[in-house]
C-alpha cells in the first residue's frame, strides 16, 4: 500500500523562473491571490506606497526591485496544496536558483511577450534540462504591443529546444487585446482591464463556428479562426507524458498585472503538473509513498527576522510524514534531534507547522549545525544527490576597516557562505579572507549584509584569481601539494582544501604537475 497516498497526490511543488522584469513577482502574487494566501497584491506599481511585493522581503531586494533570495510560499487551491518557490530574478544568482530547482517537481517559465526569450531564460532552462524538470510557460504582458505569438512560439522551440503545446491563444494584443480562447475547453475569456481580476466574462463556446464569437469579437473572430486553423496544422498537441519528461511545454497567454490568464494556467497546473516525485540518493531511490520520514536541506537563509538574528534551513520533505516534536537523525552529524519549531512560510509571514508531507517545504531553526545538502531521516543513512557547490568565477579579498571586528567578520562571512550564494576562502598563509561568487552582484549583497546585519564595515580589494578547484587525494600527496602551492591554497567554509588559480593556463599547468590529485570544479554539499 502507498503510505500517505492521498496527501502526496494532492501536492504540487514548483518554482517560477524568468528573466528579470518579465513579471515573475507579479504572477507570483496573482497565484497567491487565487490561493487566498494574500488579500491584496503588493504590485510593483504600489511600491512607492511602501507596499513591497510580498515575496521580495530582503532590504536590498526592496531597493533594487529584483528577487535576490528565493522565498517559499504555500497556498491551497481547489483542495490541492501548492508550494511555490520564488527564485532569484537576477542572473548572478544561478547557483541559488539551481539549488531551488533541486527541491521542486516542476517549473513555470514566464516570458515577456515584448522581449521574447532572454539570456537568463536560456540559462535557467539549461538548469531545468539537466534535471528533466517539467515546464509550463506563461507568455506575459499581452496588454502591451508585443511580438507575434507564432513568432514567440517558434523562438521558444528553436532557442530553448523544447516543443510548445499552446493551451490558450490570444485575440489581439496591446490596445486590440480582447482575451484568450482555450484550445481544449473551447472557452472564450474576455479581457477587461477595469473588471475585478481582469476578466470581463468566461463564455463557453461550441467551437469556432459559434455565432457568439462574431457578436463578441467582430472582425477579430475571423483572425482567431485563421490562427487556430494554422495551429491545428502546425502546433504540437498537448501530451502529458512529453510534458512530464521535460520535452514539451504547455503555453498560456495573459497579462499578470491585470490578473488575466492566470486562473486558466493555475487550473491546468494543478490538473497536470506532477505530484511529488521519487528522489535519487547515493544508495537507492526514495519514493514519496514510503513511510519512513526523509528530507534534505536545499537552502539556508540568515536573518529572515532581524529582530531575532535567526537562521532558517529550508527542507524539502521526500517521504513519510513530519509531525511537530518528532525526533530525527541528522545523518551527517550522526546525532538525533527533536524538531519542535518547524515553520511554513508565506514570504515573511511564518506559522508553526504541526504536520507536513512529501513535497512540502518546512523551515527549521539552524544554530550553525545544518548545512546545505544535509539529510534528516528516521535512522537510515541516506544522502540525497545533486546539490552542488559551483566553482566561483569572481573573487575579492576582504579588508576589515576596524581590526577589533575580526570575530564579527568571520561570523558574518561564515554564516553568509552557509546560505550558499557566496563561498569564503581562508588562506593557509596570511589573514585576509577571500570571497568567491558565481556572479558579481553577490559581492554587493555580502557588503550590504555585513554592514546592516553584523555591524561590520569592510572593503574589497581586487585579487588576481579566475577560478577555484577543490583538491582531494592521498593524505601525503595533499600535504606535499599544500607546502609547494601554499600561496594559492585556501580552506573553504566547509573545511575543504581549495586551490585558487590566477589563470586557466596556471590551473592546467598545476593539474599536469599533480596528476596524483583530483581537482574538482563542483563540490557536492557534504
Swiss-Prot record:
One of its GO terms (biological process) is translational termination. GTP binds at residues 18-25, 86-90, 140-143. One of its GO terms (molecular function) is GTP binding. The keyword Protein biosynthesis applies. One of its GO terms (cellular component) is cytosol. InterPro entries: EF-G-like_DII, EFG_III/V, G_TR_CS, P-loop_NTPase, PrfC, RF3_C, RF3_dom_3_sf, RF3_GTP-bd. Residues 9-277 form the tr-type G domain. Gene3D superfamilies: P-loop containing nucleotide triphosphate hydrolases (3.40.50.300), Peptide chain release factor 3, domain III (3.30.70.3280). Keywords: Cytoplasm, GTP-binding, Nucleotide-binding, Protein biosynthesis. It is found in: Cytoplasm. Belongs to the TRAFAC class translation factor GTPase superfamily. Classic translation factor GTPase family. PrfC subfamily. NCBIfam families: prfC, PRK00741.1, small_GTP. HAMAP family: Rel_fac_3 (MF_00072). Increases the formation of ribosomal termination complexes and stimulates activities of RF-1 and RF-2. It binds guanine nucleotides and has strong preference for UGA stop codons. It may interact directly with the ribosome. The stimulation of RF-1 and RF-2 is significantly reduced by GTP and GDP, but not by GMP. This is Peptide chain release factor 3. The gene is prfC.
Amino acid at each position: 500500500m502507498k503510505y500517505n497516498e492521498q496527501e502526496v497526490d494532492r501536492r504540487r511543488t514548483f518554482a517560477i523562473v524568468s528573466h528579470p522584469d518579465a513579471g515573475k513577482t507579479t504572477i507570483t502574487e496573482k497565484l497567491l491571490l487565487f490561493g487566498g494566501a494574500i488579500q491584496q497584491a503588493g504590485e510593483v506599481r504600489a511600491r512607492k506606497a511602501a507596499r513591497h511585493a510580498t515575496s521580495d522581503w530582503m532590504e536590498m531586494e526592496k531597493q533594487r526591485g529584483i528577487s535576490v533570495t528565493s522565498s517559499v510560499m504555500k497556498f491551497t487551491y481547489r483542495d490541492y496544496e501548492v508550494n511555490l518557490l520564488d527564485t532569484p530574478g537576477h542572473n548572478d544568482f544561478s547557483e541559488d536558483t539551481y539549488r531551488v530547482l533541486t527541491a521542486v517537481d516542476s517549473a513555470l517559465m514566464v516570458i515577456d511577450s515584448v522581449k521574447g526569450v532572454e539570456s537568463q531564460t536560456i540559462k535557467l532552462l539549461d538548469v531545468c534540462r539537466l534535471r528533466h524538470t517539467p515546464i509550463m510557460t506563461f507568455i506575459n504582458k499581452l496588454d502591451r504591443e508585443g511580438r507575434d505569438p507564432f513568432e514567440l512560439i517558434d523562438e521558444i522551440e528553436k532557442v530553448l529546444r523544447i516543443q510548445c503545446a499552446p493551451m490558450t491563444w490570444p485575440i489581439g494584443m496591446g490596445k486590440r487585446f480582447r482575451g484568450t480562447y482555450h484550445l481544449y475547453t473551447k472557452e472564450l475569456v474576455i479581457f477587461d482591464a477595469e473588471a475585478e481580476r481582469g476578466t470581463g466574462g468566461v463564455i463557453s463556446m461550441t467551437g469556432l463556428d459559434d455565432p457568439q464569437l462574431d457578436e463578441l469579437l467582430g472582425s477579430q473572430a475571423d483572425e482567431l479562426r485563421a490562427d487556430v486553423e494554422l495551429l491545428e496544422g502546425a502546433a504540437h498537441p498537448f501530451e502529458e507524458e512529453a510534458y512530464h519528461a521535460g520535452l514539451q511545454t504547455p503555453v498560456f497567454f495573459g497579462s499578470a498585472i491585470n490578473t488575466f490568464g492566470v486562473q486558466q494556467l493555475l487550473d491546468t497546473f494543478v490538473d497536470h503538473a506532477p505530484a511529488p516525485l521519487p528522489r535519487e540518493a547515493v544508495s537507492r531511490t526514495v519514493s514519496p509513498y514510503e513511510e519512513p520520514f526523509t528530507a534534505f536541506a536545499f537552502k539556508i537563509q540568515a536573518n529572515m527576522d532581524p529582530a531575532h538574528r535567526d537562521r532558517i534551513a529550508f527542507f524539502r520533505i521526500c517521504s513519510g510524514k513530519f509531525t511537530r516534536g518528532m525526533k530525527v537523525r541528522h545523518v551527517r552529524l550522526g546525532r538525533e534531534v527533536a524538531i519542535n519549531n518547524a515553520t511554513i512560510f508565506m514570504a515573511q509571514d511564518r506559522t508553526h507547522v504541526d504536520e507536513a508531507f512529501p513535497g512540502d517545504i518546512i523551515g527549521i531553526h539552524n544554530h550553525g549545525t545544518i548545512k546545505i545538502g544535509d539529510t534528516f531521516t528516521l535512522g537510515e543513512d541516506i544522502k540525497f544527490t545533486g546539490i552542488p557547490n559551483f566553482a566561483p568565477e569572481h573573487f575579492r579579498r576582504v579588508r576589515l576597516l576596524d581590526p577589533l571586528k575580526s570575530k564579527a567578520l568571520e561570523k558574518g562571512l561564515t554564516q553568509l557562505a552557509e546560505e550558499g550564494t557566496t563561498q569564503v576562502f581562508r588562506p593557509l598563509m596570511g589573514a585576509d579572507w577571500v570571497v568567491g561568487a558565481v556572479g558579481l552582484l553577490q559581492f554587493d549583497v555580502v557588503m550590504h549584509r555585513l554592514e546592516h546585519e553584523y555591524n561590520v564595515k569592510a572593503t574589497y580589494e581586487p585579487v588576481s584569481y579566475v577560478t577555484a578547484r577543490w583538491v582531494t587525494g592521498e593524505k601525503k600527496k595533499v600535504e606535499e601539494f599544500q607546502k609547494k602551492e601554499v600561496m594559492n591554497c585556501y580552506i573553504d567554509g566547509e573545511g575543504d582544501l581549495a586551490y585558487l588559480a590566477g589563470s586557466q593556463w596556471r590551473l592546467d599547468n598545476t593539474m599536469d604537475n599533480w596528476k596524483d590529485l583530483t581537482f574538482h570544479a563542483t563540490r557536492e554539499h557534504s
